[in-house]
């Protein structure tokens, strides 16, 4: 049965590719068009308060998280339902990560890190739905997330340790002559953290989606062989599902690493 | 002429992503080599693996960003 469905779908793809082949060959879509921010209710001008497709997909992500975590665990069954077990899995996964990477006393930051992970992973997965919009592919979105992480961790460090937090930059295990040079490098690497957090997430997601659209654009150039790119697209799509999860994981685990620095700044 | 040079620069920056791929492969290969020697310790080190991959990959993504800027912003 499953095989039959697969072959029928394959035949449909091939036949429709042959039937609807465009007259003039050429790249049909520009790979970067999918990232255009548009006002939801018309109007060309986008101000900071205008509801755009970014706003819409962010709220959809929040709604999806609400459905999974709040409604999914509302029954609190001894034998968990499917939604409840997914919610519990996610909770346990992040809790263990915070405890392992940042230490036991970092657990009071767990709600923030859980929120961060769930938002990024949901936004990434929603962006993989065809015709949807990927909010995390924008440097503005990931930049705000990264700057909040950076500010929160710096403030935490100074509140907990005061001026001793600056010891993070003073590598006391190194020879005295090297310490100023190392301090300079440490300061630079400290301030590059939010930049790299922001660019890693947005760059990965944007690059992956652009690759998918480049292959989709080949369909217009191949004439009646326009069904061929769907195989490449399927393969890349599977990779993108993996990347969507791994990048959310990497963002949160690096947050945990930085948090550990703020809680225990001794070098 | 300046636009053409920007395209050449974008191509050169694109090489950086490939070189970052070498770095990521290096991290994964060494992890696997270590994990096969001591499989019982491997599971506890996957977080380190991902952090290492993320750091190696970040620089490749930086050069990808430079390529994008040269293509679309310059």
UniProtKB/Swiss-Prot annotation, chain B:
It is found in: Cell inner membrane. Pfam families: ATP-synt_C. It is a multi-pass membrane protein. SUPFAM superfamilies: F1F0 ATP synthase subunit C (SSF81333). One of its GO terms (molecular function) is lipid binding. The record marks 57 as: Reversibly protonated during proton transport. Keywords: ATP synthesis, Cell inner membrane, Cell membrane, CF(0), Hydrogen ion transport, Ion transport, Lipid-binding, Membrane, Transmembrane, Transmembrane helix, Transport. GO terms for cellular component: plasma membrane; proton-transporting ATP synthase complex; proton-transporting two-sector ATPase complex, proton-transporting domain. Its main location: membrane. Gene3D superfamilies: F1F0 ATP synthase subunit C. The chain crosses the membrane at residues 5-25, 49-69. InterPro entries: ATP_synth_F0_csu (IPR000454), ATP_synth_F0_csu_sf (IPR038662), ATPase_proteolipid_c-like_dom (IPR002379), F/V-ATP_Csub_sf (IPR035921). It comes from the Bacteria. F(1)F(0) ATP synthase produces ATP from ADP in the presence of a proton or sodium gradient. F-type ATPases consist of two structural domains, F(1) containing the extramembraneous catalytic core and F(0) containing the membrane proton channel, linked together by a central stalk and a peripheral stalk. During catalysis, ATP synthesis in the catalytic domain of F(1) is coupled via a rotary mechanism of the central stalk subunits to proton translocation. F-type ATPases have 2 components, F(1) - the catalytic core - and F(0) - the membrane proton channel. F(1) has five subunits: alpha(3), beta(3), gamma(1), delta(1), epsilon(1). F(0) has three main subunits: a(1), b(2) and c(10-14). The alpha and beta chains form an alternating ring which encloses part of the gamma chain. F(1) is attached to F(0) by a central stalk formed by the gamma and epsilon chains, while a peripheral stalk is formed by the delta and b chains. Belongs to the ATPase C chain family. This is ATP synthase subunit c. It comes from Ruegeria sp. (strain TM1040).
């Amino acid at each position: 049965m499953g095989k039959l469905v697969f072959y029928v779908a394959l035949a449909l793809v091939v036949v429709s590719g042959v039937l609807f082949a465009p007259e003039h060959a050429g790249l049909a879509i520009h790979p970067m068009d999918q990232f255009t921010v548009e006002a939801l209710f018309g109007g060309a001008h986008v101000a900071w308060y205008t509801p755009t497709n970014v706003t819409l997909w962010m709220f959809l992500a929040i709604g999806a998280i609400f459905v999974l975590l709040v409604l999914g665990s509302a029954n609190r069954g001894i034998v968990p339902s499917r939604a409840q077990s997914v919610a519990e899995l996610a909770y346990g996964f992040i809790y263990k990560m915070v405890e392992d990477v940042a230490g036991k006393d970092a657990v009071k930051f767990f709600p923030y890190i859980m929120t961060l992970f769930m938002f990024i992973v949901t936004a990434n997965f929603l962006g993989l739905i065809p015709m949807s919009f990927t909010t995390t592919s924008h440097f503005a979105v990931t930049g705000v997330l990264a700057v909040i992480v950076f500010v929160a961790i710096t403030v935490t460090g100074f509140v907990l340790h005061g001026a001793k937090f600056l010891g993070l930059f003073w590598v006391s295990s190194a020879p005295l002559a090297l310490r100023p040079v190392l301090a300079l490098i440490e300061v630079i690497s400290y301030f590059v953290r939010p930049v790299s957090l922001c660019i890693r997430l947005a760059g990965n997601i944007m690059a992956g989606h652009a690759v998918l659209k480049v292959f989709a654009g080949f369909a217009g150039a191949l004439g009646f062989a326009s069904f061929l790119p769907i195989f490449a697209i399927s393969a890349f799509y599977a990779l993108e599902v993996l990347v969507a999860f791994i990048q959310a994981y990497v963002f949160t685990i690096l947050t945990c690493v930085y948090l550990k620095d703020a809680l225990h700044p001794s070098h | 002429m300046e636009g053409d040079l920007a395209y050449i620069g974008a191509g050169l920056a694109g090489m950086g992503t490939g070189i970052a791929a070498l770095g990521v492969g290096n991290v994964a290969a060494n992890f696997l080599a270590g994990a096969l020697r001591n499989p019982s310790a491997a599971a506890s080190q996957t977080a380190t693996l991902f952090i290492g991959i993320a750091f190696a990959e970040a620089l490749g993504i930086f050069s990808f960003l430079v390529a994008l800027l040269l293509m679309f912003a310059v």
